[in-house]
Amino acid sequence: MEIENQIAEARRYVANAEEIIKKANYDPELKIYTDSKYIKTAGNILWSGCLVALDAVLDIRKGKGRPSIEKYKEAAGKRDRKLLAAIVAGYDTMHLVMGYDGNKSRKVCDAGFELANAIIDRCEMLCPEPVIV
């Protein structure tokens, strides 16, 4: 898949997660979502979208199965320190806190979406310039 298409695909994941989280029933009085199932789904979709974008800009050797988060952090550290910081925060927020724990806090979920967009934006910025032939 071309790099531009991977970035667009990553953004599509974020849009899908936005639709999913709407089903989590937000309680404005408590400032929480009421259904963790949709939080978990949205968090996992967000993180998957980030992985699509990261695969576009990071050179990671593929072995058996999916590369570990450590490989992504190592590759990002060599390429761009700001991307590394976003990956560390994003992994914790989207994959662990949202995706596994299903944290219902609106602030946590909003932070997950912000981090996903930050990672994808940074990957887009780091994409090599298209070669015009």
Residues covered by each model-derived region:
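Terminal alpha-helical segments
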Residues: 1-133
